[in-house]
Design a protein with these regions (language model features):
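Active-site-adjacent beta->alpha loops and helix N-cap segments on the catalytic face
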Residues: 144-160, 168-172, 185-201, 211-212
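Active-site-adjacent beta-strand/loop module that shapes the phosphate/pyrophosphate-binding cleft
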Residues: 16, 74-96
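A structural motif
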Residues: 159, 177-180, 220-221
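Conserved Nudix-box catalytic region and its N-terminal flanking loop in Nudix hydrolases
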Residues: 20-59, 72
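A short coil-to-beta-strand element that immediately follows conserved catalytic motifs
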Residues: 64-73
């Protein structure tokens, strides 16, 4: 494989009503065999990311995916491949799963999401699964200066997540560089950012009603922060 070739991969974050999320182990014969991950696979030529995810979940686990919506995209360079990971969330699927490739799998809650070693990328971002769909006002806001990058930091009161507000596309890129868990933006900035592709971080759209949550999630937002 060419060192410069980027492989697009569809990644499914399937969440049950009780908040448990699907994880599976990588089967023997694949790189990182035995490591756990969010399931998914390579996007074939001519496929949408959603279509690739539908196919992969059926082939690997016998799960029928009804719908999914974009969450965020990130790139990672492994020893064997340079991948662009398109994370998509779904609560609309049928089936409990089958080990079609001899892998282990299960739905895990927040306190049990380490059934084994996780892939490095998944280990880094798995707590983002628990970000609420609606960001409430009960947050602490302060100013951070780190490596000459300035940002307004937003934390939930339990200090589980650290995010930032972004007023420009440049601010969004800074948030990615500073490895924040999420970013809060105005609707017009979110719309403008989509011209550059899928969000690079879980994104809250600020100043819109909670009733419009699914509208914004269908566009790629993680959630909303009401007025």
């Amino acid at each position: 494989m060419s060192e410069d070739k980027v492989v697009d991969v569809a990644v499914g974050v399937l969440i049950r009503e009780n908040g448990k999320v699907l994880l599976s182990s990588r089967p023997a014969g694949k790189p990182y065999a035995g490591y756990w991950e969010f399931p998914g696979g390579k996007v074939e030529e001519g496929e949408t990311v959603h279509a690739a995810l539908v196919r992969e979940l059926d082939e690997e686990l016998g799960i029928k995916l009804a719908d999914s919506f974009p969450w965020f995209v990130m790139e990672h360079r492994y020893e064997h491949a340079h991948v662009r990971l398109h994370f998509r969330r779904s609560r609309e699927f049928i089936g409990d799963g089958q080990a079609k490739e001899g892998q282990e799998f299960g739905f895990f809650g927040a306190e049990e999401r380490t059934p084994g070693l996780l892939l490095p990328v998944d280990q880094a971002i798995i707590k983002r699964v628990d970000l609420p769909d609606v960001w409430e006002d009960s947050t602490e806001i302060l100013t951070l200066s780190e490596n000459a990058l300035h940002a307004t930091v937003v934390r939930d009161r339990k200090y589980r997540f650290v995010g930032t507000r972004a007023g420009t596309l440049d601010d969004v890129l800074k948030a990615v560089a500073m490895d924040f868990d999420f970013v809060i933006v105005k609707p017009e900035l979110f719309e403008a950012s989509l011209k550059n592709g899928e969000p690079r971080l879980p994104t809250y759209v600020e100043g819109v009603p909670a009733a419009d949550l699914r509208v914004w999630q269908d566009k790629g937002a993680h959630g909303v922060k009401p007025c």
